[in-house]
């Protein structure tokens, strides 16, 4: 098992933090383009320094806590949400050998850590002692259950085809053909389920502004609010990295050409992650928010039966034709 040294840890975490900052800027730019606006363009050339200005503004703001809140849990919740998104990055391979830790249960570790994110949201809503924050937290917990089960069944389908739970071995198994080609319907369900799990549009019911006034983080200000948003966007990058490892082959080049092999694998991995992040933003710009009953019905009545129905035929085909890895 490969264990990273502190320098390598900083080499991956610092780009992640910068990526989160500029992902917010990219989302604002894309949303502005879709709505025929300019977007942020005042701070720096083309607004490139806008994330720095927003960060300084949040740091300099006075942190205000509700007088009736549970202060220890209230302060701990956004930190826990952000730290979980960082810890989960440990098993995502950026290139051959470029991974913080490469255990044989990497995919299960990632699934377990991502499932813990809901606790930070529940604690934030409950400790705020606000009915709007608590309503947003309850919505998040309720919508996580059916989609978590669907995600688990989809991952089982991929594991059966690959024969390994190691993240790097899953990428290496896609040298001949991307798993996203034969398992395309499964991976579409996986991406949509990840939208619901990360509370992104059109499934952002926990923070529906018109109903629950920004949801579980309505009482947060200053760095508490900043850490909540950092955790959300870090989870977007994490899930895009996971989708890249599972479907479009991870770090190998898109085309098997001599000139493509000269480009580092980490660059190819980053390009594929950026494409998934653009898909996140495009979905937010293009689709309206689901009603809560539609969200729950999609998870329980559509995705759960379909993901369960895919495990059996895929297993049967692999056993019948002796294609088990």
UniProtKB/Swiss-Prot annotation:
GO process annotations (BP): aerobic respiration
Bilayer topology term: Multi-pass membrane protein
Transmembrane parts of this sequence: 5-25, 79-99, 105-125, 144-164, 177-197, 237-257, 263-283, 302-322
GO molecular function list: NADH dehydrogenase (ubiquinone) activity
PROSITE patterns in the cross-refs: COMPLEX1_ND1_1, COMPLEX1_ND1_2
GO CC, alphabetical: mitochondrial inner membrane
Source taxon at top rank: Eukaryota
Assigned keywords, A-Z: Electron transport, Membrane, Mitochondrion, Mitochondrion inner membrane, NAD, Respiratory chain, Translocase, Transmembrane, Transmembrane helix, Transport, Ubiquinone
Reaction(s) this enzyme catalyzes, per UniProt: a ubiquinone + NADH + 5 H(+)(in) = a ubiquinol + NAD(+) + 4 H(+)(out)
Signal peptide range in chain numbering: none
UniProt main location, coarse: mitochondrion
Class of enzymatic activity (EC top level): translocase
EC numbers, comma separated: 7.1.1.2
Pfam families, sorted: NADHdh
Subcellular location: Mitochondrion inner membrane
Family according to the record: Belongs to the complex I subunit 1 family.
Function per UniProt: Core subunit of the mitochondrial membrane respiratory chain NADH dehydrogenase (Complex I) that is believed to belong to the minimal assembly required for catalysis. Complex I functions in the transfer of electrons from NADH to the respiratory chain. The immediate electron acceptor for the enzyme is believed to be ubiquinone.
PANTHER family: NADH DEHYDROGENASE SUBUNIT 1 (PTHR11432), NADH-UBIQUINONE OXIDOREDUCTASE CHAIN 1 (PTHR11432:SF3)
Entry protein name: NADH-ubiquinone oxidoreductase chain 1
GN (gene name): ND1
């Amino acid at each position: 098992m490969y264990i990273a040294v502190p320098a390598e840890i900083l080499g991956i975490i610092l780009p992640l933090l910068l990526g989160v900052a500029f992902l917010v800027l990219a989302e604002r730019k894309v949303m502005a383009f879709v709505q025929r606006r300019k977007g942020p363009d005042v701070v720096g050339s083309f607004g490139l320094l806008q994330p720095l200005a927003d960060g300084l503004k949040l740091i300099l703001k006075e942190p205000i806590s509700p007088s009736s809140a549970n202060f220890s849990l209230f302060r701990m919740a956004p930190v826990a949400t952000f730290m979980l998104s960082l810890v989960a990055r440990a098993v995502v391979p950026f290139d051959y050998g470029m991974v913080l830790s490469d255990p044989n249960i990497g995919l299960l570790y990632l699934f377990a850590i991502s499932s813990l994110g809901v606790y930070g949201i529940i604690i934030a809503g409950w400790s705020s002692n606000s009915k709007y924050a608590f309503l947003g937290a309850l919505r998040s917990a309720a919508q996580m259950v059916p989609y978590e089960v669907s995600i688990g069944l989809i991952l089982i389908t991929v594991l059966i085809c690959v024969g390994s739970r190691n993240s790097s071995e899953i990428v290496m198994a896609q040298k001949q053909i991307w798993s996203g080609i034969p398992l395309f319907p499964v991976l579409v369900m996986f991406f949509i389920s990840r939208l619901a799990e990360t509370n992104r549009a059109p499934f952002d019911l926990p923070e529906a502004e018109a109903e629950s006034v920004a949801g579980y983080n309505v009482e947060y200000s200053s760095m508490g609010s900043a850490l909540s948003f950092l955790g959300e966007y870090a989870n977007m990058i994490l899930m895009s990295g996971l989708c890249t490892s599972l479907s479009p082959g991870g770090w190998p080049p898109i085309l098997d050409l001599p000139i493509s092999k000269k480009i580092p694998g980490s660059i190819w991995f980053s390009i594929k992650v950026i494409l998934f992040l653009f898909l996140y933003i495009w979905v937010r710009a293009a689709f309206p928010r689901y009603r809560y009953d539609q969200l729950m019905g999609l998870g329980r009545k559509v995705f759960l039966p379909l993901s369960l129905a895919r495990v059996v035929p895929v297993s049967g085909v692999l056993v019948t034709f002796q294609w088990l890895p």
